[in-house]
Structure formats: structure tokens, C-alpha cells
Amino acid sequence: MKSIILFVLSLLLILEKQAAVMGQKCGSKGQLPSGSSQFPRGQKGQHYSGQKDEQHTKSKGSFSIQHTYHVDINDHDRTQKSQQYDLNAQHKMTKSKQHLGGSQELLNYKQEGRDHDKSKDHFHMIVIHHKGGQAHRGTQNPSQDQGNSPSGKGISSQYSNTEKRLWVHGLTKEQASASGAQKGRTQGGSQSSYVLQTEELVANKQQRETQNSPQNKGHYQNVVEMREEHSSKLQTSLHPAYQDRLQHGPKDIFTTQDELLVYNKNQHQTKNLNQDQEHGQKTHKISYQSSRTEERQLNRGEKSVQKDVSKGGISIQTEEKIHGKSQNQVTIHSQGQEHGHKENKMSYQSSSTEERHLNCGEKGIHKGVSKGSISIQTEEQIHGKSQNQVRIPSQAQEHGHKENKMSYQSSSTEERRLNYGGKSMQKDVSQSSTSFHTEKLVEGKSQIQTPNPNQDQWSVQNAKGKSDQSAGREQDLLSHEQKGRHQQESSEARNIVITEHEVAYDDHLTQQYNEDRNPVST
């Protein structure tokens, strides 16, 4: 035990003598123990206040002596390094001249004589040391940090431009706030530093979203601008917060990029989600329409199709895909309950819109898409689609009946335009009449529609009225209350479809669609 104690005392004496010699010569380069990476304030205060008593210095101030002359060593080494960087050396001199009062407060107001000069160098070198960007390594050899910190080569090539610009542009502003930052750090520790670091990251994200620069180069330029504007806040994060930012900075940067991409990609989804209130059902609509938009751009890259995408139109696709897709849409959405009925309406209108573009790509048909008109199709597609539309929505309940009515009216509209396509038939569409059909189409469709819609009384009446082939009997069935009900419910269904279809793509077309709520003939 005695030998261990003597050995420890001898080491302390040797270290103290070496530190004194190195301090007088203004230091030669050398490595320091691992504890020198941080600067405990309390031990420094004890050391400087107890210099008059030699025993007190040996017992309690030995560890802080290392820190004291660590500052001198850094001063000497960084002075040699700053000879290669004249601009940085000039800023060092101006800093030591401008902040004499702040340097005195840093060492707890207890230095006298030559201690003021050491305190100035100490305060100055702490700022430059952490500006170099090597604090996150827990440095033990100052010579290694000096080779990296002035030139910005230590961390990565991404931070080099930032460090150099901060020394050139933002150093004078950072000097004004450095004394207050060091003073607050001695009392409150590193808590305020981390808080201000968070403000820095938030400010960087906000400015980055404003400028819309998803590249790393633009991000670091924004960092430089934010530091120049808010140097009083950023200076407090030099010692612990800057260390943490160097360790976790790239992660935050890439996270910001991902958020920007999501925001730019789902900009319309964000608007629509803020307006929706019904259990995320309309969210499914928006995502469904986004996938449909990708398919549109994949199939057609023309300018006219792009305009139709912004207006809620669906681009041209092959007949087989449209036929299969309409079956899947009606089958899936018809199984849902109250909230799924609106989805069925919207998806049905989208599929019918695709068929419009498929058969007629003219400008007149594009106008008809926004007004709810149905284009010409082949007889086989009409029969196949009417089968799916009538059979499957009949399984739905109260809300499904309106869907059945709308799909029924739309399919009959397609047959009208198939056979005639004139303006008089469009007027008949708005009046919900089911006359003027050929015998073959009427008979074929009545055979398909009659078996399944028997669950609904209103559908049975429509099926019987259509199978009778006489326009007079159909008008009698749709007259009085049923005719008014048919017109009202079918127009409401179309209005709901058009409105929801419009919200999912572009909120600016609301006025245009509200003016065209009722079916307009082309």
C-alpha cells in the first residue's frame, strides 16, 4: 500500500513539473490522458482559487493542471496551424481583443494577473476547437484535431464547406454570444444546448421545406444561412450539442428528405385527409386514385391526358383491362357497408370514364367526362358490364340501392348512345327515360338483370318495365312518384360521385363541378 501511495505521489509530482515546464516554454506537442477531452468547471475554479497554497494544488488541482496546460498546448499548436490560415488567425486576434470581459467571467471571477491571459486563450481555443468538428471523437491528441479542424477534413467532405463558411462569415456574430453561452453552460450544464440544437434542426427543416431542396448540398447551404441569421442561438450548442449534431446530423438530414418526398408526393392526400371524417374510408379512395394516376401516366404520356388527370379524367387503357377492372371494382366495393357505398359510386364512375376515353378520345368527349356523360361502347362490353353492375350491388343494403339505380341508369345510357348517340338521346338521359332501345339489346339485358335484382322492389319494377319494350308503359311506371324519385336519387348519386371524384384530384375544380351537378347533354 505504501509503495502504491508513493508511486501515485511521485507521478503527481512528475506531472506537475512537466506541466510547469511546458507552460513556461509555451508548450511542445504531446499527448494527454483521456480525461482531458472535457473541462470540468468546478475543478478549475478550485485550482485557480487555491494556487497560493502549494499543498492544496498538489492534492486537489493536479487533474485540473492538465486541463490548464492543455489549453496552452492547444494555443501553441493552433497558433502554428493558424499560420497556414491567415484569415482564421485574424479572427482569433480580434476575438481575444473584443471579449476581455467575457473571458474573465468564464473562470468564475477568481483570476488575477497572468491568469487573465490564460483565460482569454482558454475561452478562445474552446470555441475554435469545437468549430473544427472533432469533439465527437473524445479527442486525446490535440495535434490530430488541429490537422483536421481548421481545414474541415476530419468528419467528411460534406461538412467542410459549412465549417469554412462559418469561420469566414459567422465568426464575428458568434463571438458576441460566446461569452453568454459559456457562462450559461457553467451553471446549467448541457441542457440548454440540446434544446437549442433542437431549434436549429427544426429551423433547418422549415427552411428546407420552403426552398424545396432535397439534395444534401442545398441542405448544408441552408445550415450556413440559418447559422448566420441565428448565431446567438447556435453558439450555445458548440460544446455538447454540436457534438451530438455531428453524430446524428446525417440521420436527421435524410429523415428530412424522406418527409419532403412524402409531402410532395402526397400533397393532395394531405389536403383530403384533413377534410375526411368517416373512419378512413375516403383515404382508400385517394390511394386508389393515386395508383390509377400512375397507370394513366404509364399508358399515356400525352399532354391532353395529363390535363385530364388534373381534372379527374381517366386515361386510355385497353378494353380487356377496363372490362376486368370494372368487374373487380364493383365486386370488391359492393361487399362493404355504409361507408363503402360512396367508394363504389366513385370507382364506377372512374371505370366508365376510362371507357369513354377508350372509345372516344375527342375533345367533346373530354368535356363530357367532367359533365358525367357516358361514351359509346361495344355491345359485348355493355352486356358484360351490366351483368356485374346489377348482380353485385343488389347484395348491398339501403345505400346499395342508390348505387344500383345509378349503375342501371348509366348502363342504359351507354346503350342509348350506342344505338343513337344523338342530342335527343342525351336529353332523354337527363330525364331518366328508358325508351328507344332495340329489341335485341333490351331482351338480352332484361334476361340478365331480372334474376338477381328481385330482392329490391324498385329494381323489379324497372326490370319489368324495360322487358316490355313499349315506351308508353315505361313512362307510366316511371311517372308520378317513382319517376320523381328516380330522377332525384339518380341525380344525387351522380352529384356525390362527381363531387368526391373532384375532391380526390383537385380542390380548385369545385365550382366547375357544382355548376354541372345535373346531367348535361352534349
From Swiss-Prot:
Positions with biased composition (Basic and acidic residues): 292-310, 336-345, 465-492, 499-522
A Pfam entry, by short name: Semenogelin
A biological-process GO annotation: sperm capacitation
GO annotation, cellular component aspect: extracellular exosome
Highest rank taxon of the organism: Eukaryota
Keyword Ion transport: no
Family: Belongs to the semenogelin family.
Name of the protein this chain belongs to: Semenogelin-2
